[in-house]
């Protein structure tokens, strides 16, 4: 199996320019580890999210791009929301668990996490130049109205 993402900085100057741009506009990106375990996001940052509308194109909503959002899409749950399909419905004895992706911010779909997961490794390794490249995002599924 090959490693799809660089594990070392590829272009330090591109990385430094990206970091400077994010600092200039006051954006702090979540670590992938924070999205995997959102309870590790610093308490002041979690508290600041209370004032952010989950549907707004606010970069702080990136801290909500995980499976642990509550039904209100503002709070966190310990266990991600899911359904367990019974044998009577599926015809199989194995439990089939369906994770619900409608709790994600901005477009109420997990596609934002997939896009972030592809873009952020390139940002931190200097492979994505904010000045000379454009990101392509997945369709929001809202009749080609664009992405966030």
Named regions from a protein language model:
Residues 1-148:
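PLP-dependent amino-acid enzyme catalytic core
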């Amino acid at each position: 199996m090959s490693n799809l993402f660089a594990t070392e900085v590829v272009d330090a100057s591109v990385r430094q320019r990206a970091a400077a741009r994010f600092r200039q506009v006051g954006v702090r990106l979540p670590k992938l580890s924070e999205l995997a375990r959102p309870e590790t996001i610093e308490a002041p940052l979690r508290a600041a999210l209370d004032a952010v509308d989950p549907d707004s194109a606010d970069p702080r909503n990136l801290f909500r791009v995980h499976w642990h959002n509550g039904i209100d899409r503002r709070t966190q749950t310990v266990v991600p929301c899911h359904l367990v399909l019974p044998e009577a419905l599926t015809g199989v004895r194995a439990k089939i668990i369906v994770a619900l992706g409608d709790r994600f911010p901005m477009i109420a779909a997990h596609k934002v996490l997939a896009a972030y997961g592809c873009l952020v490794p390139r940002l931190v390794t200097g492979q994505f130049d904010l000045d000379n490249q454009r990101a392509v995002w997945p369709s929001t599924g809202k009749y080609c109205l664009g992405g966030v």
